[in-house]
Regions:
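Membrane-proximal transmembrane or re-entrant/amphipathic helices at the cytosolic face
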Residues: 1-16, 456-502
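Alpha-helical transmembrane segments of multi-pass membrane transport and lipid-handling proteins
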Residues: 2, 6, 102-131, 142, ...
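Interhelical loop/hinge segments that connect adjacent transmembrane helices in multipass membrane
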Residues: 3-22, 211-254, 294-311, 432-446, ...
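Membrane-water interface segments that mark the loop-to-transmembrane alpha-helix transition
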Residues: 23-36, 62, 71-124, 138-139, ...
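Transmembrane helical elements of multi-pass membrane transporters/channels
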Residues: 25-44, 56, 176, 200-207, ...
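Helix-loop junctions and terminal segments of transmembrane helices
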Residues: 75-91, 162, 219-220, 276, ...
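Hydrophobic alpha-helical transmembrane segments
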Residues: 137, 141, 170-218, 235-239, ...
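Membrane-interface junctions at transmembrane-helix termini in multi-pass inner-membrane proteins
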Residues: 148-172, 358-389, 429-431
Length: 502
């Protein structure tokens, strides 16, 4: 509890756009992500013990339905509300800010009602499509409560992100993952399969209460409805819907990829592809998690200032690249040991695919901060077109590369798709927004990419002791370089010495 108070006090201090700020919040939310993953593993273990494979499948089916219903009805408010709120917060226009908070909350309630009605209406159909035994209509209908609460939570989360309540948001996320474990495990233990739906609903309820508690401390609830609120939320909904559509296109592309691998290859290929994809994306997500939470609101606040935008984007790329690059080299090195531990020896054929796919994350970390400029400027159509282009490229690349090189080719296809996305996004941002990449970014990228491709070459050419010693050396070099640069940029060593009284 004292840690949470300390964290809130530290994070409530005046924010800036320095390298230290980027490093602090990337580390903070990366840490929260690690905690979430660890607690998720404990929950999965509890489900495996108390529910068995069938119970885990039942839970996965219901969670999929919940996510589908949320995606169809939440109007993208958790994302679309951030740019306007950030802009008002940046300009310290408190009157308009409080008014727009009410707009967001009104539309969140509308989304909650839509989600509730959607679940209730489609529950008989979903029961017929997904089950051949028993009547689970009530289970699907009960998910309506969870979907409605998730919509309300999304609106409040957007408010906290945009108004830089990042310390409180981090605390809320920590409490949420802990409470989810405390709530779910006893229900699985005492009620087995019958506890699955109550666990989903109670976790959503606890998450909503925790988020509301912290959000209402800054923006207390007020009911002051005006018809203009519906109209003033239109731009938010346009951007939110574009974000939802892009996510839907992404989901459709993943379905198409897995269906293609199953038809042309086998179900084993689908499972192996899924395992490698999950490891790579989840691992890199430790760094990327801070972008939506901290970076996007900061960028939205200065979206119309070209100089400030360039500065924020380039600093985010630098810090994210320097943090992620050593992690990627280390991941490439340990994948032959990690995959059997996380899965089984049956998944060893996917090691090569995962190692080449790791290279894609270098280009993703260069692209992602730039792609947020379109969102920060609320250009919903441009965002949708850029995202759609990437998914089309990804599907086509996987179709071609799988035919030529099998499963390893799908990893290469992911790299090709990210390289082309980088060219497309960088080119568009340069032409449309006057974005200019700095020499520092190019210098750091050149060094870390050289190390990364060198590490990949080692995976192809070396075995045994030579493999491990060379990969370890490259990991040390990449880490030392990142620490050296971050120490210069953030005075990291001086701060550590002052904390440790060295």
């Amino acid at each position: 509890m004292y840690f949470c108070v300390f964290l809130e006090e530290k994070m409530s201090k005046k924010h800036d756009d320095s390298y230290s700020h980027v490093l602090k919040y990337t580390s903070l939310f990366g840490g929260v992500q690690v905690l979430s993953i660890m607690i998720g593993l404990v929950r999965n273990k509890a489900m495996a013990l108390f529910l068995g494979a069938a119970g885990m499948g039942f839970n996965a089916l219901l969670i999929s339905m919940q996510n589908f219903a949320s995606q169809c009805t939440n109007l993208g408010i958790s994302f679309g509300a951030v740019p306007r709120l950030s802009e008002l917060h940046e300009h310290q226009d408190d009157e308009k800010l409080h008014y727009y908070v009410q707009v967001v909350r009104l539309w969140s309630m509308i989304a909650a009602v839509l989600g509730l009605l959607f679940c209730v209406i489609v529950s008989p159909l979903m029961n017929q499509l997904s089950f051949t035994w028993g009547d689970h209509t009530l289970h699907y209908a009960m998910l309506a409560l969870a979907v409605a609460m998730i919509a309300i939570t999304g609106g409040e989360t957007a408010i906290m992100k945009a108004t830089r309540q990042l310390g409180r948001l981090a605390i809320a996320q920590i409490f949420t993952v802990i409470v989810s474990l405390i709530v779910s495990v006893p229900l699985y233990y005492y009620y087995s399969h019958s506890g699955v739906v109550p666990a989903i609903v109670l976790i959503a309820f606890a998450t909503m209460l925790i988020t509301l508690f912290y959000s209402y401390r800054t923006f207390p609830f007020r009911f002051d409805f005006h018809r203009s609120m519906l109209r003033d939320g239109a731009s938010m909904i346009r951007l939110g819907v574009a974000f939802v559509l892009a996510a839907a296109i992404g989901s459709a592309s993943e379905v198409a990829i897995r269906a293609y691998l199953n038809v042309v290859g086998s179900m084993d290929d689908v499972g192996l592809y899924n395992a490698a994809f999950m490891i790579t994306i989840t691992y890199a997500g430790l760094v990327f998690s801070a972008m939506e939470t901290d970076y996007f609101p900061r960028l939205s606040g200065v979206a119309n200032d070209y100089e400030a935008t360039n500065s924020i984007v380039n600093k985010q790329i630098e810090v994210s690249l320097l943090l992620l690059a050593p992690m990627l080299v280390a991941l490439m090195m340990v994948l032959p040991m990690l995959i059997p531990i996380l899965f089984s020896n049956e998944f060893l054929p996917v090691v090569g695919m995962a190692q080449v796919a790791v290279l894609a994350m270098y280009f993703k970390v260069l692209t992602m901060p730039v792609s947020y400029i379109t969102l920060a400027r609320r250009l919903s159509l441009s965002f949708l077109l850029l995202e759609s282009s990437y998914y089309v490229i990804l599907v086509l690349a996987i179709v071609c590369c799988f035919q030529c090189w099998g499963l390893w080719g799908t990893g290469l296809a992911i790299v090709i798709a990210h390289v082309l996305e980088n060219v497309l996004v960088m080119g568009y941002a340069t032409w449309k927004y006057g974005y200019r990449i700095t020499s520092a970014v190019l210098r750091y990228a050149a060094f870390q990419l050289t190390i990364g491709f060198g590490a990949f070459a080692v995976t192809m050419l070396c075995e045994g002791f030579l493999y491990w010693i060379t990969e370890a050396a490259l990991t040390i070099v990449s880490t030392a370089y990142s620490i050296h640069v971050l120490r210069q940029k953030t005075h990291l060593w001086e701060r550590l010495r002052s904390k440790l009284r060295i």
